[in-house]
Amino acid sequence: MLTGLSMADLSAQEKEIAIVAHRGFWNCDQAGLAKNSIAGLVQAQENDFWGSEFDVNMSKDGKLLVFHDGSVEGKSIEKNLASEFEYYRLKNGEPIPTVDQYLEQAKKYPETMLVYELKVHSNKKAESKAVRLSIEKLKEYDLFYPERVMFISFSKHICKEFARLAPGFTVQYLEGDARPDELVKYGINGID
């Protein structure tokens, strides 16, 4: 699935469209039809997509995994150790990527925007920890720049935390239950 974002006007008559690969450019043979895979990220990068969106969940031991759902085959990521997911495979045979593995590949294409979706967790304490760990990882891989990454989430708390800890970054709230004037008070500068 591809998602389009419009960018600022280049001139009065000309607009540029930015294409974001949702969960990577996974819907192709080269990526093995695997969402949130390293191969899907590579395909987005090599095909010059403006950005690539990916989903992040935190395990019980504070490890960040790139996976859309909060559970894998009924096993909660948040309630289990990351090591318990090492043997699960994506549709293309890849293991579930860690954020480290994903960011290592992301570094190779500085022109590709990372659309970092931090998933909802069970409580605000866990969400705050996941935000802090996410920022630490982005800094570790020298990717913590507003031109390289934007943050999105269905959790208002996560968005507030990213806005507080990463001023100047694009932070978009995905749930439809808040008005723009409410969100802007917290530094959240986008609604998707």
List each model region and its residues.
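Bacterial N-terminal signal peptides
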Residues: M1-G4
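Phosphate-group recognition and catalysis centered on beta-loop-alpha active-site segments
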Residues: S6-D192
